[in-house]
Amino acid sequence: MMGLLQRVREARVEIDGETVGRIGPGLLVLVCAERGDTQAEADRLLDKLLRLRIFADEAGKMNRSVQDTGGGLLLVSQFTLAADTRGGNRPSFTQAAAPDDGRRLYDHFVARARALHPVVETGRFAAEMQVHLVNDGPVTIPLRIAPPGTVQNGP
């Protein structure tokens, strides 16, 4: 399971001109389920991103997590994170989870995030979305939790 974390001052997701999710300071997280992922990988990814210390403390050092700050989470499904660009000029997405599996894992990820964190907004799975954000830093961090027994390529 993969997440691309972006520390933001604010972010929102629009579908057909309607805002469906909006946060102030916090994390915009693009989320991708890969083939072979289970709820265990989703849980580990969420635990990692909630505790990752990428927000400044009083001394200006990255020493606080989104949980520490009470910042928002904006979770957006993004199967293209699983792109394989090694051959040719057209990316392959065969490593992304099948749509039904991806939806199930994304829904689990969102439900668990809502159980653990006070401010969680989302996009809409498989929708054409426009994501607007104001990066803070910028700080952008890729996370990947691979299923046991698989080779971890990339972030």
UniProtKB/Swiss-Prot annotation:
Q: Which UniProt keywords apply?
A: Cytoplasm, Hydrolase, RNA-binding, tRNA-binding
Write out the GO cellular component annotations: cytoplasm
Motif Gly-cisPro motif, important for rejection of L-amino acids, which positions? 137-138
Report the leader peptide range. none
Q: Which SUPFAM superfamilies match?
A: DTD-like
| Pfam families tied to this protein | Tyr_Deacylase
* Gene Ontology molecular function terms on file: D-tyrosyl-tRNA(Tyr) deacylase activity; Gly-tRNA(Ala) deacylase activity; Ser(Gly)-tRNA(Ala) hydrolase activity; tRNA binding
Question: Organism's domain of life?
Answer: Bacteria
Record-listed E.C. numbers = 3.1.1.96
Among the GO biological process terms of this entry, one is: D-amino acid catabolic process
Catalytic reaction(s) noted: glycyl-tRNA(Ala) + H2O = tRNA(Ala) + glycine + H(+); a D-aminoacyl-tRNA + H2O = a tRNA + a D-alpha-amino acid + H(+)
Which compartment or compartments is the protein found in? Cytoplasm
Coiled-coil parts of chain:
none
Biological role stated in the UniProt entry: An aminoacyl-tRNA editing enzyme that deacylates mischarged D-aminoacyl-tRNAs. Also deacylates mischarged glycyl-tRNA(Ala), protecting cells against glycine mischarging by AlaRS. Acts via tRNA-based rather than protein-based catalysis; rejects L-amino acids rather than detecting D-amino acids in the active site. By recycling D-aminoacyl-tRNA to D-amino acids and free tRNA molecules, this enzyme counteracts the toxicity associated with the formation of D-aminoacyl-tRNA entities in vivo and helps enforce protein L-homochirality.
Recorded family membership: Belongs to the DTD family.
Q: Which PANTHER family match?
A: D-AMINOACYL-TRNA DEACYLASE 1, D-TYROSYL-TRNA TYR DEACYLASE
Q: What is known of its domains?
A: A Gly-cisPro motif from one monomer fits into the active site of the other monomer to allow specific chiral rejection of L-amino acids.
Subunit structure as annotated in this protein's UniProt entry: Homodimer.
The name this protein goes by in its record? D-aminoacyl-tRNA deacylase
- Which species expresses this protein natively? Paracidovorax citrulli (strain AAC00-1) (Acidovorax citrulli)
Lineage runs:
Bacteria, Pseudomonadati, Pseudomonadota, Betaproteobacteria, Burkholderiales
